[in-house]
């Protein structure tokens, strides 16, 4: 592809490829840190790992400014409506990463009366990051997997 650009001065591609490339390079995450996994999420954003290299530069505090929610930690029954409300306020297209055993399926507190057994019962999840707590490398790998999923989606519906 590079040789074609150097010789001809242009490349040909599809609209889907360009839009999906732009989406993968500008993920704006919103924190939904609920427990100890949030510490690893902050660790991934710090200087050593710097998820800004992967397009997730700044964690947003407002759901209207973000398109990626990282649910990190134990989701209790009282917090579940707030999670859904914040998810509904996010702009389209929106994605969710479930980070840690507790967010994935209840984890250590799976049999507790007050714990939701997986945030996928409340919001649709795109990528699951396992671990208790998962490392910063695992979260970065999850972001890379989400970027690959975004690249495979179709923006324009073919009729």
Swiss-Prot record:
The keyword Zinc does not apply. It catalyses: a quinone + NADH + 5 H(+)(in) = a quinol + NAD(+) + 4 H(+)(out). PROSITE patterns: COMPLEX1_20K. It is found in: Cell inner membrane. GO terms for biological process: aerobic respiration; electron transport coupled proton transport. It is a peripheral membrane protein. Pfam families: Oxidored_q6 (PF01058). Keywords: 4Fe-4S, Cell inner membrane, Cell membrane, Iron, Iron-sulfur, Membrane, Metal-binding, NAD, Quinone, Translocase, Transport, Ubiquinone. One of its GO terms (cellular component) is plasma membrane. InterPro entries: NADH_UbQ_OxRdtase-like_20kDa, NADH_UQ_OxRdtase_20Kd_su. GO terms for molecular function: 4 iron, 4 sulfur cluster binding; iron ion binding; NADH dehydrogenase (ubiquinone) activity; NADH:ubiquinone reductase (non-electrogenic) activity; quinone binding. Disulfide bonds: none annotated. Binds 1 [4Fe-4S] cluster. [4Fe-4S] cluster binds at residues 36-37, 102, 132. Its EC number is 7.1.1.-. The keyword NAD applies. Its cofactor is [4Fe-4S] cluster. NDH-1 shuttles electrons from NADH, via FMN and iron-sulfur (Fe-S) centers, to quinones in the respiratory chain. Couples the redox reaction to proton translocation (for every two electrons transferred, four hydrogen ions are translocated across the cytoplasmic membrane), and thus conserves the redox energy in a proton gradient. Belongs to the complex I 20 kDa subunit family. PANTHER family: NADH DEHYDROGENASE, NADH DEHYDROGENASE [UBIQUINONE] IRON-SULFUR PROTEIN 7, MITOCHONDRIAL. NDH-1 is composed of 14 different subunits. Subunits NuoB, C, D, E, F, and G constitute the peripheral sector of the complex. This is NADH-quinone oxidoreductase subunit B. It comes from Paracidovorax citrulli (strain AAC00-1).
């Amino acid at each position: 592809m590079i040789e074609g650009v150097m010789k001809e001065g242009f490349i040909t591609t599809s609209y889907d490829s360009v839009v999906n490339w732009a989406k993968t390079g500008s993920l704006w995450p919103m924190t939904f840190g609920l427990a100890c996994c949030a510490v690893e999420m902050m660790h991934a954003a710090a200087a050593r790992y710097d998820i800004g290299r992967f397009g997730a530069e700044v964690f947003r505090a407002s759901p209207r400014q973000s398109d990626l929610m990282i649910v990190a930690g134990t989701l209790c029954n009282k917090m579940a409506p707030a999670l859904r409300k914040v998810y509904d306020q996010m702009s389209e297209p929106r994605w969710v990463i479930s980070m840690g055993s507790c967010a994935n399926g209840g984890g250590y507190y799976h049999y507790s009366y007050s714990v939701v057994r997986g945030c996928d019962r409340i919001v649709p999840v795109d990528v699951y990051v396992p671990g208790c707590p998962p490392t910063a490398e695992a979260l970065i790998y999850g972001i890379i997997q989400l970027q690959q999923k975004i690249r495979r989606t179709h923006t324009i519906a073919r009729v």
